[in-house]
Amino acid sequence: SVVDGWTTFR
């Protein structure tokens, strides 16, 4: 999901 990708980006 998009949120999952953002967590890794953060």
Curated annotation (Swiss-Prot):
Its EC number is 3.1.1.11. One of its GO terms (cellular component) is extracellular region. GO terms for biological process: cell wall organization; pectin catabolic process. Its main location: secreted. Substrate binds at T8. One of its GO terms (molecular function) is pectinesterase activity. Disulfide bonds: none annotated. It is found in: Secreted, Cell wall. It is an enzyme of class 3 (hydrolase). It catalyses: [(1->4)-alpha-D-galacturonosyl methyl ester](n) + n H2O = [(1->4)-alpha-D-galacturonosyl](n) + n methanol + n H(+). Keywords: Aspartyl esterase, Cell wall, Cell wall biogenesis/degradation, Hydrolase, Secreted. Pathway: Glycan metabolism; pectin degradation; 2-dehydro-3-deoxy-D-gluconate from pectin: step 1/5. Belongs to the pectinesterase family. This is Pectinesterase. It comes from Capsicum annuum var. annuum (Red pepper).
